[in-house]
Amino acid sequence: GDLFSNNPTQWADRDGDGYGDNQSETATMSDAFSADGTQWNDTDGDGHGDNPYGTQGDWFPNDATRWQDSDRDGVADEDDAFPNDSSQIIDLDNDGYGDDANGTDPDVFPNDPTEWADTDDDKVGNNADAFPFDPSQQNDSDGDGFGDNERGSGADKFPNDSTQWSDIDG
């Protein structure tokens, strides 16, 4: 029988979503996706149905240039540096670490592509810090493993001589 007895422009609904299969210009309640029960309308004409939870659903039904938001953070994948992480969106220095300090693996130095972490919180990035786990030391000029800061822990008494680091006799 006629599934749309009160609508003379429709009579069949193959996918059972309640929208008719007839696509003619005069048809009302027509289904833009007659073979897909999860989709029926495409407002922006991008080929992705307006139901975001349907098959290849459009999370941005009024923007024909955007449709997918994999992490459901409200930012289209094309505009999201981290399309699979809802806690991060932007990476201004393109180092692979997100700029949101409260997000997953945040970039402590969002404007420096060579730094992203500061484990000891001494304001010197781990890559430039000779002692990334000791906030009292950052540099080791002679490379002997003892820090140059004379007031820091394990201080090098001879920061320019790699063969000496301690002065036990004062």
Regions of interest found by a model, annotated:
Residues 1-170:
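Extracellular calcium-associated, cysteine-rich motifs in secreted modular proteins
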